[in-house]
């Protein structure tokens, strides 16, 4: 016969479990709006912690001044690109708005469409039909897409607002993490030790190395490439160079490189018979492209002695899977999984990778 006390203990355990799970879910919903900002702050602080310590040492050990300087640096890094982006968009939009609003709005003839093989004549005739309809036919054609375009525009405005909010949260959390870095580090080490007494500390160190490797090998390389590409575009006289420079930065982050932007710019210069500057920009683009393959492995090695192919695969896969957050999630997960697998195959401790990289 079942003991009533055991039945009561089982019911109490189930209720306790339900209560704990409910509290966990509610807590997650409460902190959910802050997760993205806190995550970015954590990655930035981990990557720049050595820099903050050097600044603190120069300032005579004053943590408050070092934190203020780091926040100013982050402000400049986030505000200046956004300022250039908004300024470039405004500068680009004003001529287009004036052109669309002018009474003498005329669309080009585009006679060269006839020279396209096979379908050129059909495309040209359809285009001429649109021109001869005084815009009515054109409006009828694009009307089904206007709703989608408006929806897309509203979503992008919303995303810009969320970006500003998350940037403010990121700066706030960064200041807190810089100020209490040692205490938080001790708590994280205790948590890692509770998860695995044998490998917890080593896994934590590998994750830190992966974050710093990505920050140096991917983010810093992308920034250098964007700056050098922007200089080339500015000197060559390519319009909207600041906007293109920011696009190049994100293109380098997702490992496409600067060439998808630089090559059309070179073609544009040659198209406008500016062959001298087109040739100069071509040579400069080759230099920037080659520099990428030199700086990236060098900076990754500085950040950590990790497999370069594994790190870059983590960056690309993380970006495709998780978005910009995956820039750090991908390499960290892949590196830890790779080290765990190798340590299991060879029957060695993960900590040995921090001293011996012969199995890499």
UniProtKB/Swiss-Prot annotation:
GO cellular component terms, semicolon-separated: plasma membrane
Highest classification ranks of the organism: Bacteria, Pseudomonadati, Pseudomonadota, Gammaproteobacteria, Enterobacterales
Bridged cysteine pairs (disulfide): none
Native species: Buchnera aphidicola subsp. Acyrthosiphon pisum (strain APS)
Top-level taxon of the source organism: Bacteria
Name of this protein: Putative transport protein BU123
Localization (cell): Cell membrane
Chief location category: membrane
NCBIfam families: PRK10983.1
Keyword match Membrane: yes
PANTHER family documented for this protein: TRANSMEMBRANE PROTEIN, TRANSPORT PROTEIN YDIK-RELATED
Membrane-spanning intervals of the chain: 18-38, 39-59, 66-86, 161-181, 204-224, 230-250, 251-271, 280-300, 316-336
């Amino acid at each position: 016969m079942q003991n009533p006390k055991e039945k009561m203990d089982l019911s109490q355990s189930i209720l306790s479990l339900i209560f704990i799970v409910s509290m966990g879910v509610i807590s997650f919903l409460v902190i959910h709006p802050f997760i993205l900002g806190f995550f970015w702050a954590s990655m930035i602080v981990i990557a720049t912690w050595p820099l903050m310590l050097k600044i603190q040492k120069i300032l005579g050990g004053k943590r408050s001044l070092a934190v203020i300087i780091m926040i100013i640096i982050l402000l400049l890094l986030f505000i200046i690109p956004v300022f250039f982006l908004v300024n470039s968009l405004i500068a680009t939009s004003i001529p287009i708005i004036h052109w669309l609003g002018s009474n003498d709005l005329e669309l080009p003839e585009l006679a060269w469409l006839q020279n396209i093989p096979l379908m050129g004549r059909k495309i040209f005739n359809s285009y001429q039909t649109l021109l001869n309809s005084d815009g009515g036919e054109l409006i009828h054609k694009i009307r089904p897409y206007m709703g989608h375009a408006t929806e897309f525009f509203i979503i992008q405005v919303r995303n810009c607002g969320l970006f500003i909010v998350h940037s403010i949260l990121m700066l706030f959390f960064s200041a807190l993490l810089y100020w209490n870095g040692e205490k938080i580090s001790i708590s994280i080490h205790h948590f890692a030790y509770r998860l695995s007494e044998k490998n917890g500390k080593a896994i934590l160190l590998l994750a830190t190395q992966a974050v710093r490797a990505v920050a140096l090998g991917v983010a810093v390389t992308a920034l250098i490439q964007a700056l050098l590409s922007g200089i080339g575009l500015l000197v060559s006289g390519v319009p909207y160079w600041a906007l293109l420079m920011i696009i190049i930065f994100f293109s380098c982050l997702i490992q496409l490189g600067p060439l998808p932007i630089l090559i059309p710019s070179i073609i544009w210069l040659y198209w406008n018979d500016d062959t001298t500057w087109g040739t100069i920009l071509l040579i400069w683009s080759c230099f920037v492209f080659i520099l990428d393959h030199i700086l990236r492995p060098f900076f990754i090695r500085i950040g950590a002695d990790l497999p370069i192919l594994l790190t870059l695969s983590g960056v690309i896969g993380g970006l495709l899977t998780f978005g910009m957050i995956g820039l750090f999630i991908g390499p960290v997960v892949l590196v830890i999984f790779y080290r765990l697998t190798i340590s299991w195959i060879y029957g060695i401790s993960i900590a040995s990778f921090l001293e011996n990289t012969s199995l890499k």
